[in-house]
Each structure stands twice: as structure tokens, then as C-alpha cells.
């Protein structure tokens, strides 16, 4: 009798224990199903401990949940496209120039380095920076997501340094084009004056930008002076001529510039193009010209340098010292300028 009673009592206790475990597990499952993703993993761990044979599945769920949370945490907005214009001309190739010894580029004067392949073009602009025209040129280039080489005049950089900084900010290559656009091949200029024009031009660009430009130089009017060329070689400055002169400074309108460039380019097949961001008609012509280049299958090559140009400290200092700063006056405008008749 006692044995039977003991067996009955053990059965009741066992049933109660099983019911308690079942209820706790069921509650955990309901809680797990309703819980947000961020806390399901801990609940799954609790469920795994309570359910024999479920440890492997729970561990797998934990890994999947953790991976999902990590993936959500690392998702970032898609990167902005490098170019907003899907049909842009763009830049097909960037070349790095070693300027040691002063290499020359442009078949107008130099025949040694024929690095452009068929349909490749380098865009170059002289004589800036200048209000309205240079910003218009920059916009046209930016709209086509393409790059150029700029050869600014030193004096112009002191007049409009903020525009030259826009050129740099847009990612274009910047060289120099003398201090005052002097003809260095003129008999009126001696070797020392020519060197001063070169060095002062580079220092002016550096002063405007806040950093040294590329060691790229173009002679004004493409007037190459032998002594000056030798000097450029000692300073490891690359000399730029051109393959194709747009003669934009002679053009009566934008259409003439476009026709001149495309006619020559279709005949030659490639080349370094010389233009002027100083010229109004060039700024007007550029959007259409870039579209014509794209339609004609031409590709843009950007030229860069391995190392920035090392300006001469004494020239930098002299240029800063010689810069004329307007004298501020405490007098009001009305006491200086008065309208007496209108």
C-alpha cells in the first residue's frame, strides 16, 4: 500500500514538474515571437537552456540574428555618383609626368614624347584667372565632369586669387605662364629678366593658392627662348607647347572657335589643345565644343605631376613684400565723393 502511495505521489510531482517546464518554455516562445529583433537573441539563449537538444539551433539563430543586426548597423546611404551627368565627356586617363630635366610636350615644338593615343585630347587654358570667363569655363568643364591644365598669368592671380582657388578646388592641374605675359624671346628681355618672369609667375600662383603649383610652364605666345628653356630644365619644369592652337583670341565668335578646333582635330586625330580662359568667346564656345568632342568619340587625358614645384624662397618673400595693399581710410564715402550734378 505504501509502495503504491509512493508511486502515485512521485507521478504527481513528475507531472507537475513537466507542466511547469512546458509552461515556461511556451511562455518563452511567445515572448520570443513578440520580441523585437534587438532582444530575440538573448531570449533564444534562454529557450535553448530550457529545451534539451535545442542548443545547436539556438546558437545558429543567435548568429543569424547578430549578423542581421550588424548588417543593419553598417548599412550606409549609397555613395553620391562621381558625376551627375551620365553622358558626360569625363576623363578617360590620368598621366603622371616626371618633369626631371624639363621635358617638352606638344608637337608644335616638341616631337619626343608622343604619349597620346588616337582620339585622346588634353585641354589647356592660358591667361587666367579672370572674372566671369574663367568661372564660365570651370562650369562647362564641371558639367562634363572633365579636367584641364591651366597656365595662369602671375599678375592675374594677384588680382583674382579666389578664382584661381576655384580652379584648384575643381581638381584641375595648375602650372604658370610668367608674371606679366612677357615675350621671353624678345630682344628687350635679357636672361635675368626672363628668369625673374618665370620664377615670379610661379611664386604668384603659390601665393594665391596657398600651396605650390605643378612644375608646368607655357611660354607666352609660344615664343621659346633657348636660354630660358635651358633654365627651365635646371629647375625641372616641363615645357608645354601645343598640338592644336584654337586661335580663340582672334575668333569673332564662339562658332568660329568650335569649327577651328574640330576641323584641326578631325585631321590630326589627337592632341594638346591651346585655349584661353581669359577670352569671352572661349567660355561661350566650351559647352558646345565639349559636346562635339564627346560625339566625335574623343577622350580627355588629364596631365598631373609627381611632385609640386619648389618655388624660390627669396622670390616668394620679395613678391609678398612688393604687393601693394590699398590704404584704408576712416573718412566716410560721402566726404570724399559728392554728387554735384545729375
Language model features: what each stretch is:
Residues 2-123, 130-136, 143, 292, ...:
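N-terminal pre-catalytic segment of deacetylase/amide-hydrolase enzymes
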Residues 79, 83-189, 197-204, 213-214, ...:
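Active-site beta->alpha N-cap acidic-glycine motif
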Residues 125-128, 151-155, 178-179, 218-222, ...:
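Active-site-proximal beta-strand/loop segments in catalytic clefts of secreted hydrolases
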Residues 133, 182-209, 223-269, 282:
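Alpha-helical scaffold elements lining the catalytic groove of polysaccharide deacetylases
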Residues 136-137, 162-163, 228-231, 285-289:
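A short acidic, amphipathic alpha-helical/loop segment
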Residues 147, 173, 238, 245, ...:
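Residue-level detector of anion-binding/catalytic polar loops
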Residues 164-167, 189-192, 255-258, 315-319:
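Short low-complexity, flexible loop/linker segments enriched in glycine and/or proline
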Residues 262, 266-304:
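Catalytic grooves of carbohydrate-active enzymes
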Amino acid at each position: 500500500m505504501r509502495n503504491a502511495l509512493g508511486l502515485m505521489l512521485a507521478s504527481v510531482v513528475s507531472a507537475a514538474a513537466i507542466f511547469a517546464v512546458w509552461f515556461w518554455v511556451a511562455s518563452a516562445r511567445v515572448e520570443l515571437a513578440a520580441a523585437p529583433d534587438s532582444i530575440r537573441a538573448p531570449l533564444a539563449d534562454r529557450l535553448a537552456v530550457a529545451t534539451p537538444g535545442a542548443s545547436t539551433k539556438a546558437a545558429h539563430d543567435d548568429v543569424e540574428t547578430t549578423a542581421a543586426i550588424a548588417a543593419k548597423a553598417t548599412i550606409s546611404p549609397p555613395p553620391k555618383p562621381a558625376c551627375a551627368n551620365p553622358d558626360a565627356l569625363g576623363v578617360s586617363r590620368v598621366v603622371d609626368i616626371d618633369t626631371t630635366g624639363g621635358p617638352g610636350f606638344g608637337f608644335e615644338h616638341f616631337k619626343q614624347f608622343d604619349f597620346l593615343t588616337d582620339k585622346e585630347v588634353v585641354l589647356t587654358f592660358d591667361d587666367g584667372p579672370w572674372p566671369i570667363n574663367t568661372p564660365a569655363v570651370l562650369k562647362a568643364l564641371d558639367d562634363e565632369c572633365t579636367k584641364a591644365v591651366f597656365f595662369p598669368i602671375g599678375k592675374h592671380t594677384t588680382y583674382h586669387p579666389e578664382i584661381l582657388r576655384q580652379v584648384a578646388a575643381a581638381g584641375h592641374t595648375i602650372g604658370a605662364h610668367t608674371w606679366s605675359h612677357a615675350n621671353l624671346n624678345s630682344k628687350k628681355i635679357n636672361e635675368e629678366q626672363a628668369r625673374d618672369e618665370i620664377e615670379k609667375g610661379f611664386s604668384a600662383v603659390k601665393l594665391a593658392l596657398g600651396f605650390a603649383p605643378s612644375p608646368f610652364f607655357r611660354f607666352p605666345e609660344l615664343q621659346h627662348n633657348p636660354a630660358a628653356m635651358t633654365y627651365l630644365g635646371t629647375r625641372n619644369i616641363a615645357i608645354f607647347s601645343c598640338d592644336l592652337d584654337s586661335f580663340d583670341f582672334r575668333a569673332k565668335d564662339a562658332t568660329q572657335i568650335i569649327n577651328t578646333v574640330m576641323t584641326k582635330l578631325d585631321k590630326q586625330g589627337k592632341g594638346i589643345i591651346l585655349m584661353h580662359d581669359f577670352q569671352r568667346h572661349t567660355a561661350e564656345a566650351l559647352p558646345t565644343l565639349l559636346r562635339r568632342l564627346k560625339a566625335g568619340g574623343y577622350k580627355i587625358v588629364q596631365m598631373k605631376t609627381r611632385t609640386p614645384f619648389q618655388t624660390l624662397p627669396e622670390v616668394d618673400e620679395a613678391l609678398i613684400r612688393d604687393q601693394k595693399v590699398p590704404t584704408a581710410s576712416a573718412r566716410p564715402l560721402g566726404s570724399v565723393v559728392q554728387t554735384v550734378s545729375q
